[in-house]
Amino acid sequence: MMRSFVSLISLLLLLSFSSSVLSTKKSSFQKLPVPGNRTGPEAFAFDSTGKGFYTGVTGGKILKYLPKKGYVDFAQITNSSKSSLCDGALGTTNVEKCGRPAGIAFNTKTGDLYVADAALGLHVIPRRGGLAKKIADSVGGKPFLFLDGLDVDPTTGVVYFTSFSSTFGPRDVLKAVATKDSTGKFFKYDPSKKVVTVLMEGLSGSAGCAVSSDGSFVLVGQFTKSNIKRYWIKGSKAGTSEDFTNSVSNPDNIKRIGSTGNFWVASVVNSATGPTNPSAVKVSSAGKVLQTIPLKDKFGDTLVSEVNEYKGQLYIGALFGPFAGILKL
């Protein structure tokens, strides 16, 4: 299984490189190759300064990108994350020692950066960076196994995050998808109480999550089921969930678009041979698809993991790709 997974990652990386020839012809699209032997800038976060972005990559590092300087090291999940063992760790190689940051988001009031590490649990990084502090790797005595998406409520500071599966770890992601595993979960962490709570269970590949701009609900994607659910956190429906949309194919990370009420969703078509036709899909607060931007000419047939709008540009991540992309709107 591991050999086939590594082979798939290698193929996806090759496709990502080959597509770069086409993308350089697009003046509105910019590639920001990840330095060294790291890959997979999966998600993005922006601090209060508004200068550059933060992203997690293979081997357990969090990088900060500065427009005039490029990528610099900001933080690491474990002490080993900066070692030669973790430099060049392909896909899920050595995830138990190195870590693999998946979802990331700032608490804009405190400056703390929260990270859902796929293999090692929920972490927090102080505004100065450095070694991440583990908050939790289990709830109720049950290990998370495979964390994925994360968002922070900008008003309350409550952290919402997902687990792709409670049966399979990151090394067995293909098996989780192939068997249509439905043991994913949706959690919240309240920093004021230091307690993790399970909000939803029985999810099929729960990937991205995003708090709405008015703070009334959280969207939770089900990659395997091509479905997005809405979990209410305020109002008469608080504590209940419902289907939000089935119109987005294999949704990964979900990001709110400022105060507009809309969201960007990273989407692919999961075929028998692997992910294909990546796209950025904008949906309204009512679940209506407003816009679809094809990304195949820029990323090839790879798994685009996040589309995050910031100051008139889309920041696009890829789970296995060698670069982050910026698309001007």
UniProtKB/Swiss-Prot annotation:
Entry EC number(s): 3.5.99.13
Catalysis: reaction(s): 3alpha(S)-strictosidine + H2O = secologanin + tryptamine
Record keywords, A-Z: Alkaloid metabolism, Glycoprotein, Hydrolase, Signal, Vacuole
Associated pathway: Alkaloid biosynthesis; 3alpha(S)-strictosidine biosynthesis; 3alpha(S)-strictosidine from secologanin and tryptamine: step 1/1
Main location: other
Record's GO cellular component terms: plant-type cell wall; vacuole
InterPro entries recorded: 6-blade_b-propeller_TolB-like (IPR011042), Strictosidine_synth_cons-reg (IPR018119)
Pfam family, one: Str_synth
Enzyme class: hydrolase
Localisation: Vacuole
SUPFAM superfamilies: Calcium-dependent phosphotriesterase
Entry keyword annotation includes Glycoprotein: yes
An example molecular function term from Gene Ontology annotations: strictosidine synthase activity
GO biological process: alkaloid metabolic process
Signal peptide coordinates: 1-23
Glycosylation: residue positions: N37, N79
PANTHER family linked: PROTEIN STRICTOSIDINE SYNTHASE-LIKE 11, STRICTOSIDINE SYNTHASE-RELATED
Family: Belongs to the strictosidine synthase family.
Function as written in the Swiss-Prot or TrEMBL entry: Catalyzes the stereospecific condensation of tryptamine with secologanin to form strictosidine, the key intermediate of indole alkaloid biosynthesis.
Protein name: Protein STRICTOSIDINE SYNTHASE-LIKE 11
